[in-house]
Amino acid sequence: MAKQASESNRAFGVHSEVGQLRKVMVCSPGRAHQRLTPSNCDTLLFDDVLWVENAKRDHFDFVQKMRDRGVDVVEMHNLLTETVAIPEGRKWILDNQVVPDQVGLGLVDELRGYLESLTPRDLAETLIGGVSTHDFPDAHGGEMLKLVREAAGMTEYLLPPLPNTLYTRDTTCWIYGGVTLNSLYWPARHEEPILATAIYKFHPDFAGKVNVWWGDPTRDHGLATLEGGDVMPIGKGNVLIGLSERTSRQAISQVAAALFKKKAAERVIVAAMPKLRAAMHLDTVFTFADRDCVLLYPDIVNNIAAFSYRPADNSAGLELRKDEKPFVDVVAEALGLKKLRVVETGGNAYMRERTQWDSGANLVCASPGVVFAYDRNTYTNTLLRKEGIEVITIVGAELGRGRGGGHCMTCPITRDAVDY
């Protein structure tokens, strides 16, 4: 208990990719994943339906293995339950989610009344799991509900399910001493930042203790989209951000300017990547395994062009220059290292592509040289072990069906710096 109290009082902040992981937020599989069907999983950004019971078991195993390594793991359903138990928190979420553009003008009051009647736990489950017209009680619906059911069927959603909350990395990201509240690319994920932001604003563990560098989920950011899988605070004032399928140059420039204005970072290294589903974020092709060791998918990373933002005395507050060195060398130089040890996702071209599809490069560090990785990527895990990395395996058969691994499934809230 004394240790838990000490961890809860520690200042929030993520100061490296490999320092001791102290506190992390996850979101367990649940009702939202039971909504996945062969006809809707593509729209909801999953490649297949999940065996939900097994996904829950495997996620619990991952959480327990992190706790065994001293990590304080907090779960989003639980945090949201405690947040909506606070009247101001519940009101803020419903004010921003139960709106005419989402629900339809004729059902706003009815849906709001139904949600207000739920217990905090049921409301949290519903906000993540969604509300279909089939779920919605006839007593609350009236003629508009009959119209919606007649026109769209019983699987029409008044609030959409959010199965991608499983990948907590993307919705918000902690960069040194503060956090960004991200604007996500695909419509299937647009509601997620509201829930995470409410936790930071109203939950007693976070309220009044969070520095927000950038982002406001209550407004439309247009083309400025940012997802946490592209963001890595690697240390020494440097931040890596992937310019990818889901993170735009508009957002990167705004985040860089905000960080520089608040003296939260000294350099933002932009990794210009191809826009591919199999390489949707930087962390799907490049992650750290130790203070001086990275795992990468060479077919993509060897073709990344690096650009660097630095503070400048101009109207934008920043300047951008192309880095002439290869991307990995740019990262090493930024950390003051002569070079990084590089482990490539291995095998022939077929194995490399399969490993990439199975999130083989998506490691998350518990501490320097200790990583969590999917068990199925046996060849790459063996290469890591030969390099002296301790690989703790987690089962990825179900959890990876949305194309994310351990790095994607964790939102670090507190992580130690590394002495470079």
From Swiss-Prot:
Keyword set includes 4Fe-4S: no
Lineage: Bacteria, Pseudomonadati, Pseudomonadota, Alphaproteobacteria, Hyphomicrobiales
Any one GO molecular function term: arginine deiminase activity
Membership in a protein family: Belongs to the arginine deiminase family.
Entry-linked SUPFAM superfamilies: Pentein (SSF55909)
Originating organism: Bradyrhizobium diazoefficiens (strain JCM 10833 / BCRC 13528 / IAM 13628 / NBRC 14792 / USDA 110)
Protein name: Arginine deiminase
Gene Ontology CC: one annotated term: cytoplasm
Disulfide links within the chain: none
Record's catalysed reaction(s): L-arginine + H2O = L-citrulline + NH4(+)
Location in the cell: Cytoplasm
Residues forming the catalytic site: C408
Matches recorded under InterPro entries: Arg_deiminase
